[in-house]
A protein has these predicted regions:
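ATP/NTP phosphate-donor binding region
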Residues: 1-51, 55, 91-107, 118-128, ...
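Short glycine-rich anion-binding loops that position phosphate/pyrophosphate groups of nucleotides
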Residues: 12, 58-60, 83, 170-172
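N-terminal glycine-rich "phosphate-gripper" loop used for MgATP/nucleotide binding
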Residues: 54-58, 65-67
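Proline-centered loop/turn at the N-terminus of a beta-strand
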Residues: 72-76, 192
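Catalytic core of DAGKc-family lipid kinases
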Residues: 85-162
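ATP/nucleoside-binding phosphotransfer catalytic cores, i.e., glycine-rich phosphate-binding loops
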Residues: 136, 141, 152-155, 204-288
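Short aromatic-centered micro-motifs
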Residues: 149, 171, 228
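Gly/Ser/Thr-rich active-site loops/lids in small-molecule metabolic enzymes
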Residues: 154, 158-202
Length: 288
């Protein structure tokens, strides 16, 4: 049986093309057939594959997630972007990372995703999903979007705003973080809700339970429509009177992990956080 690996590359980066050549050599040495993906490739067009290698930043990894969701295939990200929160390896490590992937020397980390539905006033339904976040934003910069939030079928608060972000723990370091939301450790199965520039006293970030359903209604009197964007890629229109529903999905994305480093260590590294003066380890060693 032929072993195949998906190879997704950020083509606009010259370093990505060089990294791809190195990855292809490692796959050839391991007897694994590479399947190169273009920007137009859809999941339905792909042959069966057992591995996925992504060379780029978080945006490229989100593109790869579209192709691997529901397959159970582990996804290995090699960071060629800026922060690269979803990536596991850096450019200089691409050869060793691909080798370990083909040899099965990695762990699996499952990241939850969101299911999204937009119910229009005429009864039509649009569906989407997100690994990071589903972001409802206004379509006119001069006006505010009027919404009412609902949790598990109960109204919570109505206000005017620039938008509302619904995020997974994975997405808590992305758009939700920029909007003032908390950083949430990836093993927390919460649904994070972050109002954007809300005109209300009670419009603070919320963390809902893993089984909660978030409803966002664009009030009929809202003078503008909204646009719901999933992971910055898939867009759904939300007219006044429409309703958005967000809940956790049972179809996670599987990330290949080569290092046992805890999330705290990754957070410090990715954000270059200062930890000068920490004596926790020394104090722990002093305890009886």
């Amino acid at each position: 049986m032929t072993r195949r690996a998906l190879v997704i590359t950020h083509r606009a980066r010259s370093e990505a093309l060089a990294a791809r050549e190195e990855a292809l050599r490692q796959l050839e040495d391991a007897g694994v057939e590479p399947v190169l993906v273009s920007d137009e490739t859809t999941a339905d067009e792909l042959p069966s594959f057992e591995l996925a290698i992504v060379l780029g930043g978080d945006g490229t990894i989100l593109r790869a997630a579209e192709l691997t969701r529901g397959t159970g295939v582990p996804l290995l990200g090699v960071n060629l972007g800026h922060v690269g929160f979803l990536a596991e390896a850096e450019r200089d490590d691409v050869g060793e990372a691909v080798r370990r992937l083909t040899e099965g020397r990695f762990a699996i980390e499952e990241r939850s995703t969101l299911e999204v539905r937009v119910l229009a006033p005429d009864g039509s339904v649009q569906e989407g999903w997100a690994l990071n976040e589903a972001s409802l934003e206004k379509t006119d910069s001069a006006l505010i979007l009027e919404v009412v939030l609902e949790v598990d079928g109960r109204p919570l608060s109505s206000f005017g705003c620039d938008g509302v972000v619904a995020a997974t723990a994975t997405g808590s370091t992305a758009h939700a973080f920029s909007g003032g939301g908390p950083v949430v450790w990836p093993d927390v199965e919460g649904l994070i809700v972050v109002p954007l520039a809300a005109h209300a006293l009670f419009a603070r970030p919320l963390v809902l339970g893993p089984h909660s359903v978030l409803g966002i209604e664009v009030i009929d009197r809202s003078r503008i429509a909204g646009r719901l964007t999933c992971d910055g890629r898939r867009r759904l229109e939300v007219e006044p009177g429409a309703r958005v529903e967000v809940r956790h999905s049972d179809r996670p994305i599987r990330l290949a992990r080569l290092s046992p480093a805890p999330f705290t260590t990754r957070l410090v590294h990715k954000f270059d956080l200062p930890v000068v003066g920490w004596r926790g380890r020394a104090r722990a060693q002093e305890l009886p």
